[in-house]
Structures are given as C-alpha cells and as structure tokens.
Amino acid sequence: MTPQLLEDIAQETKKGQHKLHVINYLLAHQTATMTDIAKELYVSIPTAAKILQELQEGGCIQEQGKLEIGIGRFPVLFGLNPKGGYFIGVDVKRSYINIGLIDLSGLISHEDYGIPYSLENTPEALEVICEEILLFIERHELKQRDILNINVNIPGRINPVTGHSYNLFNFFPDRPLASILSERIGTRVSIDNDTRGMAFGEFTQGCAKDLGVNSALYVNVSWGLGLGLILDGQIYFGKSGFSGELGHISVYNNQILCHCGKKGCLETEVSGQAMCRKVQARIRGGENSVLTPAVLRGEDLKMSDLIRACAQEDMLCLEVLSEMGLQLGKQIANLINVFNPELVIVGGSLADSNGFLTQHIEASVRTYSMSVVTKDTRIETATLGDKAGLIGACMLARTRRFEERSK
C-alpha cells in the first residue's frame, strides 16, 4: 500500500473512512462488486467507482475476475491485493516464541516455531523479543515499509486499546508497552492477551471457522487458565481489556495462594501448574508414574513432562487430568448458562491429549448446565493446537491495522 493511501485511511475524513470501510468489507467478504460497495457505503455507483480506483492505485485491491451470474455483462469482482502489505504475529510462550507473517489477503507465508526463550519480567527478556522480531524480518528479507503492523501476544492482563501490559514488562507505567516496542522495532506494534490471540486464531482459521459459528468461548488450559470470548463475530474485551480471567474466579477454600495474590482461584486447582503440584505430591506419597524417577531426583516437573506422560497413557497423570476436567466442566457449565454460545473450544497445551480432557469437561457440563441451554452448544477440542496463538497474532495484526474509528 502506498504511503498516500495509508495516510488517507488514517484521516477522520469521510473519504478516508469510506476507503477504510471498503478494506474491512473485503476482509470480511473476500470479494465484492462495485454495486456491493455502493450499497454498503450508501453512495452512488460513480462515487464507488472512484473509491475503488483509488484503492487500486494505492496497491490495496485488485480485480479478481468477474461474477458470472445471469445474462449480459458480468460485473467485475474486487478483492484485496496480497502484495498490498504484510503483518507479523508474535506469540510469546513460557519457554519459546513463535513468529509468523501473513499477507494482506491473510495467507501465511512464513512461520518460525519454537524459538528458544525464557519468559521473565525483566528488561532483558523484553529486549530478546525485540531482537527476535528484527532477526525474523532480516531472515526473511522483509522491508520495514511493507510491514503494516506487528501484533505481540503476551500472557497476563493487557489493554489492547491503550497498549498497556499490567503484569509483564510494565517498567514504564506512563508509557504503553506497545509504543515502547514500536520505537524499538521501527514499525507499528499492537499487543494483546495470549488467550485472546488463541481464540481469534481458532475463530478465523480453526475450529470455529470450520463449523461456521459466530459465537464461541475458547478455554485455554495451559500453565495457567484463561478464557477468550467471541460474541456475535467480535472479540469481547471488556471495559479495560481484562475479560476472560476465568482462572481467577474464586471457587475453592483451599488456602492456596494464587500468583494474582488471592486465595482459592480456579487456577490453583485447574491448570498446568496445579497439575504439576498434584502429580508431584502424589508421587512423593508413594504412587507410581513414568515421572516418578524425575520427581524422586528432586526435579521440578514442566508442562512438557505432563504432556509426554499423558501421551504415554500414564495412569496417574490421566487421573489428575480427568479430575481437573470435571472441575473445569462445572465452571464452563456456568459460562454456558450465562452466554449460551454456539461453541466451546478447549485449547491450550493440556488439551492436546486426543480429546481426553474435552471428554471429561463435556461430561461435567452435561451434569451441571441446563439442558435447554446446552443442547445447541458444541464442545470441541481446538484444531490448531500450538499454532492457534501465532495465527491469531497474525490475524490480529491485520485487524488492528484497519480498525474503524466510527461506524
């Protein structure tokens, strides 16, 4: 996209907003005729033709054949130009980073998975993220001017509108993390919560898209426990961007201190860290597991250990996971009673167990939810696995770049 077009769509003028609206229409519908655009904008055909011409000249859209219907002259179809711009998505995990690139049409062209990383709340750890993004740009011979936005998914409480992170990398309270990243990397940057990124990935390219649903709850069962909400085709952020704190609803009288500072949070009994604690305690209590040697050597269990043990059908780990599934299902039943979604997606590291966790969640949901509400809700395991966060980050980068300021 040309600098002039980018400047146009950034303006609050009617002309600029019309162009931005056309871009968003094509993001949602892939193609459109001139008549479609005229109707969408409530403008005349000549005005629509002028807008489409300027978008074409700006490198944003292109002709994509003709709509072959009826008789007479077939109308030209317009769609986004894949070479009109690129978007980088960054998914930050506890022990690695995934980085990917999509073009304007949403096609993924580069994916770098499993870049070693240690997530710590330090300036040094933040600098590593910046360095890896710059290395990705260099490695794939990308030009900074062609990158229209970068979106970084980060765990914790994030306000994507202001660009502030409230748990990690908040070293400069008066400066949004997004602006710090943008200054360091040299291009526009947005940030969002990791679970919302995963939810958006499944919504745009995964399970929700495959099933054609418009409302979905994404439950992220990983080291922590999070929730992403897609309501009527839109991410629900809440007033300050803090929606989805499922792991921190007060459920238990267990006196276990959560990292949020409260006691009795759902995450203290249902999460990867809770599973590590429970498995280690039961092994030390005399129960057998494939993880017994490591625990007795004094090693701390990691998520990868639990996932590997479940894949090997370790009875102790599967028993703990099934108990967690039943407890989580009870809380998901409450969410279904409140939101009545079309779909509940069970994702995250611990969901990749051949549907084992999902089965126990579903059994519990059927027990604790109202059947008249649940009967139209599907519960499915996420289809994208570890790719969900990266795909969501890429798609969020594109969505954020073209957000409309007024409807």
What are these regions (language model features)?
Residues E63-G65, V189-N193, L229:
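General beta-strand structural signal in soluble alpha/beta enzymes
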Residues F87-D91, I147-N151, A216-N220, G226-G228:
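Short glycine-aspartate micro-motif
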Residues I108, S165, I235-Y236:
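Hydrophobic "anchor" residues
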Residues D194, S222, A393:
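Active-site glycine-centered loops adjacent to acidic/histidine catalytic or metal-binding residues
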Residues E111-S215, F356-T367:
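Glycine-rich phosphate-binding loop and adjoining helix at the ATP-binding site
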Residues M1-Q64, I69-G72, L77-Y113, Y117-R145, ...:
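ATP-binding/phosphotransfer module of carbohydrate and carboxylate kinases, centering on a glycine-rich
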Residues D103, P160, I230:
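Short, acidic, Ser/Thr-enriched surface-loop or helix-capping motifs
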Residues C207, G212-V270:
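Glycine-rich phosphate-binding loop of actin/hexokinase-like ATP-binding domains
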